[in-house]
Amino acid sequence: MNFSSLLLKTRKWFLTASALFWTWPGVGAAETVQQHHNNYLVYRIDPQNDQLRLFWQNPQGNRFGSFRRLRDYLTAQGQQLVFAMNAGIFSTEYAPLGLHIENGHLLRPLNTAKGWGNFFLKPNGVFFIANKKAAIVDTTAYTKLKVKPDIATQSGPLLVSKGNLHPKFFPDSLSLYIRNGVGVTQDNQVVFAISLVPINLYEFATLFRDTLGCADALYLDGSISQIYAPSLGQEFLGGDFAGIIAHVR
């Protein structure tokens, strides 16, 4: 499969009348979005111009775990944490459950096993950036790609794949949690979202497809979901995560 075939050049913007939108150079774009009376925080990144990184452990091999420790580490390096969100689902040992690539280095391999829980609700998938181009593909498709990502996180299930919702999502599901995920638009924008109220996976998937304009989107996690985004008034610095995905400058 040709990686470039996954990326379309058509430039589109998907902003709803219910969204409050603001942006300034180097800080990404922040929105508060409402869909079906549910509120979400949304943060957009342009990988052509913004530095999106993935973190798990510091150089000493200790897990960052919280936004505070990551922020303090970056500050000591002369860098700024602009935005952060927990990345893909992790194990009880606080290790990424699937593929985890930082700065081009493979730290955890692709997980193609069968199992129980959201991660293994097939199709699951991989979000990655390679040569400043973002993509989300299902795990099987990823094995066929000849690509060397700068960053990658595997999770599951896929919320949206090529414009189609996951076949095992149902509108009347009573599995309600605070949830976070990531999507990619046709113009190579990366879109992160977190719900402010408990929702089901069907509702979350329709947010990415119908309101945020993402033909592909990946579920990151639920119940433990958190966001650090001062531009949205969100300055939570706690957390107990494995992977953390961050906009750094």
Where are these regions (language model features)?
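Short acidic-glycine loop/turn motifs at beta-strand connectors
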Residues: 46-48, 128-133, 161-163, 184-188, ...
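Bacterial N-terminal signal peptides that target proteins for export
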Residues: 3-14
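Active-site-adjacent helix-turn-beta-strand microarchitecture at beta-sheet edges
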Residues: 95-169
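Bacterial N-terminal signal peptides
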Residues: 16-23
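Conserved, well-ordered active-site substructure
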Residues: 95-113, 168-216, 225-249
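Short, solvent-exposed aromatic-acidic interface loops
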Residues: 59-60, 141-145, 194-198
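Zymogen propeptides
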Residues: 26-118
